[in-house]
């Protein structure tokens, strides 16, 4: 594997199992994703939560769109897959028992505007959520804030969005996290979950 890829994957804080992969996406690709998301307004929906995919603005307020399975986003789907595969290879190299086999469950893009948020939550659970092994979030733009960070309560970690950065972390009860309420600017992310095949 490319040594440069391994060097770019760092653990945010020792023992946190929150990994950052800077420049996982090129600036031009991030800008293209944002532009194409904004031009697909008819496919946007209010952010959903839980296994029943319900709207609950007490927990999450954002504008989301699934891009996987759409012909006009196939190139973006492949770009995210390639980025994720490189990062997973680096994680596997560091942790012998993180062997898979794994796959993603498809990709979505999310926009958060001032006053919006994703309050404290975890990304695992029973039934169809039980296969989830990692959360993947790509930041598609720089967010000066205040607000917009990804914050982890048990690890005392707060990550500021930086264009092109990918973060990976476990979805379990150990990693309760939130998207801090954005007070200024607009935040764009792409997301997926890594699951067992």
Give the residues covered by each predicted segment.
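Catalytic core of non-heme Fe(II) oxygenases with the double-stranded beta-helix
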Residues: 71, 78-197
């Amino acid at each position: 594997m490319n040594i440069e890829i391994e060097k770019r994957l760092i653990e945010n804080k020792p023992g946190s199992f929150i990994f950052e992969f800077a420049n996982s996406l090129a600036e031009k690709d991030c800008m293209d994703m944002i532009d194409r998301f904004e031009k697909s307004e008819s496919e946007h929906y209010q952010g959903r939560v839980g296994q029943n995919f319900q709207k609950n603005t007490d927990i999450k307020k954002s504008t989301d769109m699934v891009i996987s399975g759409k012909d006009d986003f196939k190139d973006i789907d492949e770009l995210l897959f390639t980025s994720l595969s490189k990062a997973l290879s680096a994680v596997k190299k560091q942790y012998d028992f993180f062997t898979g086999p794994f796959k993603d469950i498809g990709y979505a893009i999310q926009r958060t505007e001032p006053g919006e948020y994703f309050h404290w939550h975890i990304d695992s659970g029973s039934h169809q959520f039980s296969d989830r092994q990692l959360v993947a979030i790509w930041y598609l733009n720089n967010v000066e804030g205040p607000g917009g960070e990804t914050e982890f309560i048990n690890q005392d970690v707060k990550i500021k969005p930086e264009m092109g950065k990918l973060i990976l972390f476990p979805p379990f009860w150990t990693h309760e996290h939130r998207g801090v309420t954005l007070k200024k600017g607009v935040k764009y992310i792409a997301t997926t979950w890594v699951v067992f095949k």
